Every structure is written in structure tokens, then in C-alpha cells.
């Protein structure tokens, strides 16, 4: 009996504790969803509801240290919304309408009553519960901001059926992909290195696999992606074009869950769940198996040829995250990401050079990757302020090894061996310490501020060479240029709802970059304003400045391990940009349709590029002697029409854009179009939910061709030939277009994904290469063959089908 009484007492104590949880809230005419954020921070509870029931619901409440149950009752009084607190969840629903009942019989009867049902009964429509993670564009002051869920990423058909974050963003207006099939991204006339990629707020320098065919983000464990391209939050700086923060899932307390995905080119596994009552975990692993698939193919090729081909490649992504809840006010987290690429290529030839059994073995080994680790604490200081403190480490490394071995035997049988070896590596190591605060000083105002310190360590290039013969051994090392830099950033911004119609976001970001005993600084003001004359329409304007201290040196537009990240040193100045944007936004009354038009103009200064004839510089010349700084502009208009809800969703967008560059040491100092000066870009994305089991997806993209420099003349010397100077980016490729399709079929345990890349097999031209054609000409001595230079179009990817299966458990 005592045990029963004790259990009852414990139960009543728990119920009393939950119902008596105290909160402090002050809001006047604010949207209910906004007030929920305050309640979540103070109680840690989850609010479960359909977003439809809160449309247009504004609440006024001002309480101090009152039970949550009483606060909710006061908030929803007279709104027709009911709530129920169950465990850690607060569930909301509409109150049922009162109904009038009429007795079937006038008095108690002991008789059998027979009813006939109408066969033409009215069937109720299915109840669809929808949730929208991001606020509609008309409700915010931001321009060019987008929040994308993992489901939206998976609904974008891509190459090899690999759901890809960056390729999903390529479907947004103002964003172009660069080279076909690659995960590069060029935003509003910017370069590929002007985008800041972050994983849970930690920067990453290399976000691609296999020259950019795949990005480094495993969609299976992603929660959502924040993307900014016009009005930049003051929190972010360091890049000129865009900011992308990929947020990972947290583990769940409601049991262990996971999935296993098997595809033609890769597989992935993820698992999550609780560890005790206060800790959760999530683990994700993705690996390609090109190294396995190429084994039988190479075995067949090498069995028939004297030349033996060597090719082996794989990539891997590993994510792990642990979250621990100390109390409703404090939560700690730790996470790690490791991305790894390995490429081995080369050949072994039998030579016929007069020596017995002579062979040449030529090998290249590439190894590159990322490591990101962080630990942090979220802490609610008081009902109006919360903070996050983080320590992080991010590293990019790249290593290339080349070995060329020649073996033979002399006439007297003595072995003859020569070997040439070369090793080149570059890396970046950053230690990051940051503190971010979120403060709500009064109704309608949300202030964010913080600071961070970064210790950079750059090793742009380190090369060693070894030459070995039977009688000598010569080893050389190129000069190593290593840099250490200290970076300090601070920011503050206020997201202010001035009135029901006016809102604004004003902030400033200050930065200091110290290297080689010199300090460089940047002040980046940010301002965006919105006027909303009615519930369905808004007009916005924004200005932002950005400063960039690190840059990527690349001689191609592919994501290669030989690309180098270097800091601003010596005479070079940090890149800066100033951007203005205006836009109009509309949303239908039923929240199903949305449309927007945005215009922008961007000025860029101190851009870095290789100067003309940089290849004539001595090989060991300092890298900065080959560079020059200049300026650029970008302008354009982005239009978008979007259907948000329903069985058929998607969007159509069109961009009209111009982008140019001007360098004193390029193109004779005259302006020239940027490589990705794509005048017209059209994107169409459609998602059709055919039934509960089947979904069809289609993505069509088309844009004006990329530009590049076509050299029409060559200077031939006695020992070499070199191109004569031509106008930079003087040729434009043909119009690019492609259709991708996918179909998702669900079953009880998981789902199949069938995809078709380049469905109508249009071979797009991605480059022009110089070749030589043999031409026979009649002379006085008869026909004579000569080589004539010609230009050939390079076309890459035809129609490519793929299939994968995901098992969920």
C-alpha cells in the first residue's frame, strides 16, 4: 500500500511540475508563431500544430512567472484554438463547432428502431496537414533569402540520383551552375570562391567530390539550409556573393531510427536515437564505390592492350553529432565531419626503344578532404536573452604525388632504372572561437549580436622533387610559403517590426585581419526595409557591403584538389562589394501561390585574377607575382512564380543578368564579360504527388552559354609555341538546356528512386579545344600532308539513368 501511495505521490508531483512550469512573456499583437519561439526557449517544449490554424492569429499577452497552462489559456481565449499538454509536447487544434442534437425518440422506448442510410452520402475531403518551415517572403524584411528543407532537396532530380544541396540551390533565380553537372555555384555575377559554405555555422573550404560532380553534404541527415544572396545578415561576412549554412538533424528522444540507401554509384547509412533521457545522437556515413565498379572494366581493357591503365577513385562523408540537455535552459552539443577523396591514376607501357624489356610506369596519387569539429553550449540567460558559445576547428588538406619509373636492361644484362618523383601539398587550418547572443528587449524587436576570433594557418604550396638513377640521387625542395593570420569579427543587428506595415533589419559587421605584421580591416553595414500595405503584398529595399580576406586560385572551373586558398598579403587589398536590391512580393489569399521580382546592382573591387601571360613567369616565382587586382560589376532582375501547396508544387524563374570585369593587367586594361555572364537563365521545377506512394519530379534548366577566351593565332618559335594575346572571354558557347526527371515510389519499408539525367539527351557544349587536322595538299612534288589547327566542341554528359533504394527503419 505504501508503494502505491508513493507512486501516486510521484505521479501527482510530476503532473504538478509540468502544469506549473513558469514562464514570462510580453507580446502585443504579435503572431502566435513568434510567441511560441519565446515559450520554446523557456520551457523546451515542442509545439505541434498545423500551420493553417495560426494564419492571421495575433495574440496579446503580458505575464510574469506564471504557469505555462494559464499563459496558453490566456493567449488562445476567444481564438477558437484548443491546446493539450502531453509530456514534452503542446498540441494545438481548432475548437469543434457547437452542434445541436435532437432526440430520435420522444421518450424512453423498448422498441427496435430501423434506420435507412442514404446511399448518396457526401464524402468528406481528406484532411491535409501542411507545415511551412520558412516564413512567407511578404512577412519578412529580407531580400533573396531562402530556407530549403531536406525534402525539397530530394525532390530535385540530379545526376546519378544523388540528392545534392548545391544543385538544388542552382535552381534558384540568380544562381548558375558553372560547368555542366558540377556542384559549383555562381551567384549574381560572382566567382565560385565568393560563396561561404558552412556546416552548422562552421566554414568549409572544399565542398565538392569528384571535380564537383557531387557536393560534400549528405542529404540524409540534413534538417534545412539557410541561403542568403541579397540582403545579408550582419552575422555573416567574409564572402562577396552568398552565404549558405547547412544545419544537421538532432537525434530524437522517441526511439532509434535510421535508413540505408543503396544506389548505382554510392551508398549511405544513418542512425539516430536517444542515449539515456537527456542525450541524443545522429550518425551518417556515405561512400561511393567507383573503385569497386571500375575493377572488372579495367581488367577487361588491360587484358587486350600493351598499355595497362590504372584508375581508382572513391569519396566518403562521415557525420556524427551528440546533443545533451542539462536543463530547459542549457543544451550542449558536439559534432564532427570528415570528408575524404582518393584518386589513383596512371599507366604502364611496354616501350620499344631498343632496350630489352623496357617499361615505363607513370602514376599519380591524389588525396584531399575536409575535417570539421565543434563543441558548443546553448544557454538561456533569461526569458529575453539566449546565447550560444562555440569552439570549432576546420581543416582542408590536399596531397598530390607523382612517380614516373623507367626500367630496362642493357645489352650486357645490367638493369637500367630511372625514377622521377614529385610531391605537392597544400592545406588550411582554422581555429574558431565564437559567441552569439539573441535578445528581445521589447515587443517587435529582436537584437542579435556577437563576436568571433579565427586563427588561420595557410600553406598554399609545398613541392619536393626527387630524381634517382643508377649513379645519382638529386633531391630539391621549392620554397615553402606558409602564412599565419589572426581574424577578429564583431556584429550587431536589430530585426525591428516598426508597425503592422513597416519592418526593418539594420546591422553592421566589423572585421580585422592581421597578417605579416600588417592589419587590414573592413566595415560592412547592412540595411533592409519592408513596406506591407496589405496581407498579400510587400515592397522591400536593401543595401549590404561585404569584405573577403581569403581567395581561391584555380586555373580551371572544376573543383580540383590542386586549387589553392591564399590570404590577402603584401600589396593586395581585401575584396569588397557593395550591393543594392529592391523587390516586390505577392502571396495569394489562400497561401497557395507566391510571386516575386527582385532587381540588384553590385559593385566589386580588388578582385583577384591571373594576369595576362602569367604562364611566362618562372615556375618558382612567388604566386602573388602572377596575380593582378581589378574591379567588376553585376546587375540583373530575378522573377519567380511559385506554387507552395497542393499535389502539384514547384516554381518557374527567369533571370536577366550582366556581369563584367576590368583589370589593368588583363585584356589591355579594357572591360570584358565575366566567364559566367549568362544573359538569360530559365529554371522550371515541378513536383507532382500522384498518390501517397508515387511522386514525380521534373527539372528543366536553360541559360545562355558560358564565355571563354578563344585563341585564334599562335606564335611559333624555334623551341616552343605560345598563344598570341586575344580579347578575354571573346567567345560564347551555345545556349545550354537540359531536362532531368525522377520518380519516387514508396512501399512499407522505404522507397525506390528512379532518375533520368538529360532526359532528351541534348549534348551541351561545355568547352572548345584546339586540335590539329591532317590536310593533304597538292604541290609540285605531289600530295603533301600538313597539320592545320582546328577548333572542336567538347560535349560531356548524355542521357544517364540511375536507380536507388532507401530502406527506413
What does each of the following model-derived ranges do?
Residues 601-603, 625-710, 806:
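Gram-negative outer-membrane beta-barrel transporters
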Residues 263-287, 304-345, 365-387, 393, ...:
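Transmembrane beta-barrel wall of Gram-negative outer-membrane proteins
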Residues 107-116, 126-135, 139-193, 201-232, ...:
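Periplasmic N-terminal accessory/gating domains of Gram-negative outer-membrane beta-barrel systems
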Residues 329-380, 395-427:
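Flexible loop and strand-edge segments within Gram-negative outer membrane beta-barrel domains
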Residues 342, 397, 462-466, 535-580, ...:
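Surface-exposed extracellular loop regions of Gram-negative outer-membrane beta-barrel proteins
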Residues 16-104, 145, 187:
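N-terminal export/assembly leaders
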Residues 292, 693, 702-719, 744-809:
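C-terminal beta-signal and adjacent terminal beta-strands/loops
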Residues 430-434, 478-484, 489, 573, ...:
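Outer membrane beta-barrel strand-and-loop segments of large Gram-negative receptors
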Amino acid at each position: 500500500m505504501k508503494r502505491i501511495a508513493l507512486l501516486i505521490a510521484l505521479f501527482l508531483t510530476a503532473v504538478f511540475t509540468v502544469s506549473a512550469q513558469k514562464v514570462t512573456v510580453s507580446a502585443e499583437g504579435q503572431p502566435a508563431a513568434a510567441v511560441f519561439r519565446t515559450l520554446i526557449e523557456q520551457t523546451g517544449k515542442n509545439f505541434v500544430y498545423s500551420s493553417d490554424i495560426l494564419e492571421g492569429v495575433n495574440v496579446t499577452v503580458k505575464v510574469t512567472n506564471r504557469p505555462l497552462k494559464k499563459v496558453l489559456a490566456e493567449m488562445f481565449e476567444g481564438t477558437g484554438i484548443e491546446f493539450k499538454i502531453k509530456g514534452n509536447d503542446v498540441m494545438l487544434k481548432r475548437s469543434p463547432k457547437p452542434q445541436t442534437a435532437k432526440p430520435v425518440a420522444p421518450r424512453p422506448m423498448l422498441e427496435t428502431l430501423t434506420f435507412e442510410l442514404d446511399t448518396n452520402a457526401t464524402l468528406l475531403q481528406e484532411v491535409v496537414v501542411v507545415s511551412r518551415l520558412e516564413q512567407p517572403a511578404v512577412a519578412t524584411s529580407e531580400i533573396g533569402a531562402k530556407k530549403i528543407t531536406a525534402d525539397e532537396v530530394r525532390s530535385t532530380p540530379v545526376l546519378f540520383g544523388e540528392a545534392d544541396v548545391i544543385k538544388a540551390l542552382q535552381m534558384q533565380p540568380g544562381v548558375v551552375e558553372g560547368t555542366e553537372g558540377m556542384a559549383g555555384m555562381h551567384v549574381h555575377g560572382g566567382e565560385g570562391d565568393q560563396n561561404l559554405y558552412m556546416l552548422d555555422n562552421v566554414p568549409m573550404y572544399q565542398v565538392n567530390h569528384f571535380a564537383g560532380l557531387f557536393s560534400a553534404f549528405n542529404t540524409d541527415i540534413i534538417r534545412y539550409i539557410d541561403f542568403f544572396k541579397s540582403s545579408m545578415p550582419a552575422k555573416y561576412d567574409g564572402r562577396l556573393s552568398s552565404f549558405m549554412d547547412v544545419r544537421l538533424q538532432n537525434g530524437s528522444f522517441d526511439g532509434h531510427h535510421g535508413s540505408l540507401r543503396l544506389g548505382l554509384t554510392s551508398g549511405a547509412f544513418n542512425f539516430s536515437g536517444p542515449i539515456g533521457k537527456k542525450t541524443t545522437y545522429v550518425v551518417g556515413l556515405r561512400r561511393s564505390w567507383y573503385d569497386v565498379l571500375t575493377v572488372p572494366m579495367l581488367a577487361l581493357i588491360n587484358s587486350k592492350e600493351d598499355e595497362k591503365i590504372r584508375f581508382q577513385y572513391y569519396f566518403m562523408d562521415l557525420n556524427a553529432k551528440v546533443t545533451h540537455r542539462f536543463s530547459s535552459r542549457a543544451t550542449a552539443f558536439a559534432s564532427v565531419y570528415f570528408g575524404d577523396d582518393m584518386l589513383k591514376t596512371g599507366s604502364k607501357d611496354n616501350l620499344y626503344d631498343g632496350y630489352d624489356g623496357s617499361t615505363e610506369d607513370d602514376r599519380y596519387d591524389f588525396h584531399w578532404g575536409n575535417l570539421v569539429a565543434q563543441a558548443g553550449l546553448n544557454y538561456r540567460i533569461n526569458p529575453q536573452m539566449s546565447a550560444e558559445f562555440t569552439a570549432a576547428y576546420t581543416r582542408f588538406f590536399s596531397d598530390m604525388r607523382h612517380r614516373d619509373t623507367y626500367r630496362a636492361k642493357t645489352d650486357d644484362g645490367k638493369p637500367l632504372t630511372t625514377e622521377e618523383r614529385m610531391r605537392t601539398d597544400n592545406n588550411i587550418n582554422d581555429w574558431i572561437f565564437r559567441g552569439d547572443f539573441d535578445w528581445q528587449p521589447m515587443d517587435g524587436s529582436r537584437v542579435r549580436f556577437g563576436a568571433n576570433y579565427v586563427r588561420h594557418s595557410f600553406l598554399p604550396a609545398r613541392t619536393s622533387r626527387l630524381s634517382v638513377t643508377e649513379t645519382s640521387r638529386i633531391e630539391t625542395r621549392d620554397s615553402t610559403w606558409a602564412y599565419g593570420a589572426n581574424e577578429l569579427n564583431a556584429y550587431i543587428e536589430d530585426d525591428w517590426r516598426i508597425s503592422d506595415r513597416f519592418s526593418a533589419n539594420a546591422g553592421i559587421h566589423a572585421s580585422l585581419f592581421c597578417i605579416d605584421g600588417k592589419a587590414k580591416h573592413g566595415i560592412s553595414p547592412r540595411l533592409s526595409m519592408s513596406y506591407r500595405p496589405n496581407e498579400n503584398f510587400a515592397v522591400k529595399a536593401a543595401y549590404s557591403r561585404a569584405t573577403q580576406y581569403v581567395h581561391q586560385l584555380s586555373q580551371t572551373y572544376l573543383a580540383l584538389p590542386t586549387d589553392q586558398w591564399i590570404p590577402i598579403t603584401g600589396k593586395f587589398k581585401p575584396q569588397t562589394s557593395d550591393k543594392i536590391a529592391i523587390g516586390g512580393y505577392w502571396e495569394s489569399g489562400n497561401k497557395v501561390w507566391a510571386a516575386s521580382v527582385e532587381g540588384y546592382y553590385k559593385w566589386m573591387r580588388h578582385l583577384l585574377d591571373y594576369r595576362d601571360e602569367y604562364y611566362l613567369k618562372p615556375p618558382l616565382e612567388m604566386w602573388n607575382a602572377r596575380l593582378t587586382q581589378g574591379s567588376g560589376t553585376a546587375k540583373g532582375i530575378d522573377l519567380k512564380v511559385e506554387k507552395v501547396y497542393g499535389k502539384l508544387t514547384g516554381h518557374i524563374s527567369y533571370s536577366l543578368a550582366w556581369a563584367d570585369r576590368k583589370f589593368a593587367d588583363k585584356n589591355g586594361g579594357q572591360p570584358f564579360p565575366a566567364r559566367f555572364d549568362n544573359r538569360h537563365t530559365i529554371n522550371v521545377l515541378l513536383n507532382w504527388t500522384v498518390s501517397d506512394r508515387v511522386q514525380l519530379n521534373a527539372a528543366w534548366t536553360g541559360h545562355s552559354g558560358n564565355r571563354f577566351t578563344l585563341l585564334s593565332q599562335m606564335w611559333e618559335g624555334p623551341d616552343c609555341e605560345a598563344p598570341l594575346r586575344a580579347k578575354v572571354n571573346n567567345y560564347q558557347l551555345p545556349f545550354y538546356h537540359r531536362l532531368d526527371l525522377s520518380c519516387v515510389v514508396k512501399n512499407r519499408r522505404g522507397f525506390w528512386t528512379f532518375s533520368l539525367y538529360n532526359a532528351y539527351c541534348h549534348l551541351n557544349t561545355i568547352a572548345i579545344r584546339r586540335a590539329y587536322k591532317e590536310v593533304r595538299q597538292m604541290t609540285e612534288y605531289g600530295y603533301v600532308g600538313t597539320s592545320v589547327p582546328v577548333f572542336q566542341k567538347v560535349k560531356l554528359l548524355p542521357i544517364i539513368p540511375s536507380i536507388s533504394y532507401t530502406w527506413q527503419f
